[in-house]
Amino acid sequence: MATRAWVAAAVALNPQLLPLRSCSPTKSVSPAQRSASMGLRLRSGRPCLGKFVCRRAKNAGYEDYKFPDPIPEFAEQETSKFREHMAWRLEQKKEDYFGDHVEEIVDVCTEIMGTFLENDYRGPGTLLVHPFLDMKGEIKERGLPGAPQAARAAIAWAEKNVDKDWKAWTGEY
């Protein structure tokens, strides 16, 4: 009974939520028969979590939204800014983490970031973690020190600047 009331209340509040199946039993069974058939298991008063379909989300047309293509000029400019920042940032921590390998680490990070911006970055919401994992992996593979610190510095810069610079470049504020 409580389940039916809960479903009715949910449908009344949001008619877009409709159950795919009913949570209530299909045949009418007395409570005594139900407890006997369930082997003395007690049922909680909570409604079962049926599968609900949100038609509003299903029909919202998310498939129709297309991110813009990458902009090569933007990628080139942003890669240049990234290189400058990484060289400056890693130079600050040279003694602690990177030693004499700052330039090599900056080259690895810049190459990966540039490739990502040229091929995969399509505006706000498309900055992925993969290039930063690739940076860390490549630095480690080459036997260079400070892979986690370099990747962390790259992520911090990208989160702060890339989407903001894209909006300024395209005029979308």
From Swiss-Prot:
Organelle targeting sequence: 1-55
GO BP of this protein: regulation of gene expression
Subcellular location: Plastid, Chloroplast stroma, Chloroplast nucleoid
Effect of inactivating the gene: Pale yellow green leaf phenotype. Reduced levels of plastid ribosomes and defects in plastid mRNA metabolism.
Principal localisation: plastid
GO cellular component: chloroplast nucleoid
GO MF terms held by the record: DNA binding
Domain of life: Eukaryota
Annotated keywords: Chloroplast, DNA-binding, Plastid, Transcription, Transcription regulation, Transit peptide
PANTHER family: PROTEIN PLASTID REDOX INSENSITIVE 2, CHLOROPLASTIC, PROTEIN PLASTID REDOX INSENSITIVE 2, CHLOROPLASTIC-RELATED
UniProt function note: Required for the activity of the plastid-encoded RNA polymerase (PEP) and full expression of genes transcribed by PEP.
Name this polypeptide is given: Protein PLASTID REDOX INSENSITIVE 2, chloroplastic
The gene coding this protein: PRIN2
